[in-house]
């Protein structure tokens, strides 16, 4: 059901349950043909397969980190694809879930650079609330199959989010870890952002 993934069909228009400041900057995306197709594809995936994150958390990155409060963007590829891991924030896992290797590596870098101990929890909600947009380029994934939703159209939407930040904000730190994330460098004006 679209309601469960933050998408509601209203006649032929699509309404997205997303934080107000993001909705203002991205509302033009919701009426584009790709978004209607994306909505239908995601609905079918959630209806016919086990998918992550839970539907109500698909737009969690946007809902926890309003547009005007973004200071840092950490870009991932797609959500974790095992049960109980994905929570709509790139690299984050709920309290009590074992740290995935990618998050362990992030924590090791922080420990190396700042001499901070590695946290036991992988829940990065606090980061999001402090202005870190933990964004995956693809917002959903089928269980046990990495990159399974990469061709559904999410990247059109998340690229638009990056482009909106690039155009309407300044001095945001973009952390593009890995080859896939670095491919998004083309969306960012290095004269305005780090």
What residue ranges belong to the model's regions?
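A polyanion-binding, active-site-adjacent surface
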Residues: 16, 28-176, 180-189
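Short, flexible loop segments at boundaries between secondary-structure elements
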Residues: 192-194
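Generic N-terminal amphipathic, Lys/Arg-enriched alpha-helix
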Residues: 15-25
């Amino acid at each position: 059901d679209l309601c469960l993934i933050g998408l509601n069909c209203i006649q032929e228009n699509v309404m997205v349950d997303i934080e107000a400041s993001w909705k203002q900057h991205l509302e033009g995306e919701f009426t584009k043909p790709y978004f209607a197709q994306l909505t239908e594809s995601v609905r079918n995936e959630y209806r016919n397969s086990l998918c992550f994150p839970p539907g109500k958390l698909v737009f969690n990155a946007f809902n926890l980190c309003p547009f005007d409060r973004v200071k840092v963007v950490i870009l991932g590829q797609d959500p974790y694809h095992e049960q109980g891991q994905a929570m709509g924030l790139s690299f984050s896992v709920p309290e009590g879930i074992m740290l995935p290797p990618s998050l362990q590596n992030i924590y090791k870098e922080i420990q190396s650079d700042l001499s901070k101990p590695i946290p036991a929890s992988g829940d990065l909600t606090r980061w999001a609330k402090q202005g870190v947009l933990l964004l995956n380029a693809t917002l959903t994934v089928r269980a046990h199959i990495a990159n399974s939703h990469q061709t559904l159209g999410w990247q059109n939407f998340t690229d638009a989010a990056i482009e909106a930040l690039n155009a309407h904000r300044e001095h945001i730190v973009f952390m593009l870890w890995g080859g896939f994330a670095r491919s998004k460098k083309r969306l960012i004006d290095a004269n305005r952002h780090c």
